[in-house]
Amino acid sequence: MRVHGDNLGPHSVASVRHAYASLRAKFPQATVAAATLSQMAAEVEPLSQSLPLVTQEIGDTWIYGTGADPAKTSALREVLRTRTEWVDSGRLEPGGAQDLRLLGELIPAPEHNWGLSTSVYLRSRTGYRTEELDRSRREDPTFAANDLEWDAKRRRPRDAVLVLPRPQREEATARLDELSTPAPSVPATLAGADHHLANEMMRASISADTGAISALVDLRTGRQWALGSGLGAFSYQGFGVEDYRRYAQRYNHAAFTANDFGKPGLDRYPVEPLLWRPGGASMAHVGQDAVHVELETPPPAVDPTRLTAWPTRITLRYTLAPDQATNDLTCWVTGKAANRRPEALWLSFLVAGQDRNGWRLDKVGEQINPHDVIDGGGRYLHGVGRGATYRDAEGGFDLETLDAHLVSPGGFGLLRFDDEPLDLTEGMHMNLYNNLWGTAFPQWYDLDMRFRFRVRLHESGEARR
């Protein structure tokens, strides 16, 4: 078998002729022919019983970068959900002409070239302080070129729906427009006590200290589902030089990775690992079914190096659905300046479930046990579809995610590539944003962000969806 290398485009005529000649010389009794991967799989299928079978999850280790552009990822997921609804309702024929036009425009969106190659077009070893980055984006053509390319690729999901007939095009565009709904206003006074929401099926207590759900009780069973820091706890994580050294030693020693996967020039700055969580919140009830929360933002003293670009606002909204065991959570991150320093934003969900095999992750329609990852695979970060579910003999917990898709089981697992077992009593942690990976992914981001989640409780015996 002869395949082409990564990012090299189609074979040239000369390379095709050379491939045929060399293969015929090496295998004179064989028939040499071009084939698709599907045709190759069909040829191998009769031999499948004699081949090794791997049933464990591999765990893609190259998915960090997809968290670098929340707007693009959210839009892509929204268009795909809309397409699924059209197919389910009979409004779109799967594999029909309209569907293929739409998918043809969408296919480039998840592909890993989200812009220019950073190892070639972003070799600057400066720009890690916010004022340096601002100046470079204004004055340095290479920085500006990267911005333009990331912006163009970000528009791909929105541009894709333009190939649809007018009714569907307008519907999809309206749904994409809703993704930019701004954060609500919340009174500036700090909440003196926890706030509570309840319906006939569940009761939620929202902490005045963290803004997270500190208690979530299924009123049908009396079970308390929130553990530790609760459900919906926000965190900011900054990474330092030592984090990247450890990651390089563990993951990839190749020389090219310093520029391609790393942060060239970061060692020139006094950057240290940093973890910050809000220490207070303002809250306000909106009717009987919703609470708006404004989280405290950090004082400058948290990072005197001026290497961190904090959001100016972090806003949460909790909404209970009437007569349902569901709680919707929306998180807005507003006014965050662009920052080249490696960083990540998280929303954590610590669930009171003690069955170590109770968790499953929805990955391309399959229910994956996060413990069942092959040795050397990526067990600490997964890309999910609907989200994560937990089941035991006494009930169940669903965490559905509409916009964010990267989940780290058992703790913050970015830049971690060991084979230590997971401790899922430490919950599921949704990565809202990170700029850790290089290649062609955005290295900074200054758009407002919005993330939607749904928590659903189940009585015992209810199946996963």
Stretches with model-predicted labels:
Residues 1-157, 287-465:
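Catalytic-domain carbohydrate-binding cleft regions of carbohydrate-active enzymes
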Residues 100, 108-114, 118-335, 445-449:
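Catalytic and substrate-binding regions of extracellular carbohydrate-active enzymes
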